Amino acid sequence: MRKNESQRETKETEVSVSVLLDGTGSTTVNTGQPFLDHLVSSLGKHAMFDIDLKASSRDGIVHHLVEDVAITLGGAIDKALGDRSGIMRFGHASVPLDESLSEAVVDLVKRPYHRIEMKIKRPEVEGIAKEDLEHFFDSLLRNLDCCIHLTVKYGNNDHHRVESAIKSLAVALRMAVSADPRREGPPSTKGSM
């Protein structure tokens, strides 16, 4: 069973998360930030990960909460993948949300690189600063320890841009973490990821 339970406790926040990669998309998320809850729930729902995440701020600073949720969640997914043997490794998805379109391309090789183009226009979306939303994706992907290109192609509504981005990432991750029944060991000519 590909599962991980992780905690992160600092003077700024307290975060606990349980992730089951081979789940049904069931999520229970409570961070105190409704849009952050929505993003994490959307990731779980469309990646088919079961996610139970609780987070609280100790200092009242939204940036710290957003960052620590992403760090803990990304790390938990990474740990749940183990040595990444027998997985598809690659995934890609284009996902619309009304007028917005996003694309995610994933390689679960353990070489961290990511490029994110969000194209958020407003200073904040649903009570979270633009730079904190961008930092959420950055921290999540950095701690997932893989290579991901995530691009919002276009859109007029910033909420839709961000939501289509998380959903395209989720669908691409679902593909990449899927078991490959024909593969034994790591999906790499090197013999390890």
Curated annotation (Swiss-Prot):
<dbReference type="InterPro" id="IPR038494">
    <property type="entry name" value="IGPD_sf"/>
</dbReference>
<keyword id="KW-0963">Cytoplasm</keyword>
<dbReference type="GO" id="GO:0004424">
    <property type="term" value="F:imidazoleglycerol-phosphate dehydratase activity"/>
</dbReference>
<protein>
    <recommendedName>
        <fullName>Imidazoleglycerol-phosphate dehydratase</fullName>
        <ecNumber>4.2.1.19</ecNumber>
    </recommendedName>
</protein>
<comment type="similarity">
    <text>Belongs to the imidazoleglycerol-phosphate dehydratase family.</text>
</comment>
<dbReference type="GO" id="GO:0005737">
    <property type="term" value="C:cytoplasm"/>
</dbReference>
<keyword id="KW-0368">Histidine biosynthesis</keyword>
<comment type="pathway">
    <text>Amino-acid biosynthesis; L-histidine biosynthesis; L-histidine from 5-phospho-alpha-D-ribose 1-diphosphate: step 6/9.</text>
</comment>
<dbReference type="Pfam" id="PF00475">
    <property type="entry name" value="IGPD"/>
</dbReference>
<keyword id="KW-0028">Amino-acid biosynthesis</keyword>
<dbReference type="InterPro" id="IPR000807">
    <property type="entry name" value="ImidazoleglycerolP_deHydtase"/>
</dbReference>
<dbReference type="InterPro" id="IPR020568">
    <property type="entry name" value="Ribosomal_Su5_D2-typ_SF"/>
</dbReference>
<keyword id="KW-0456">Lyase</keyword>
<dbReference type="GO" id="GO:0000105">
    <property type="term" value="P:L-histidine biosynthetic process"/>
</dbReference>
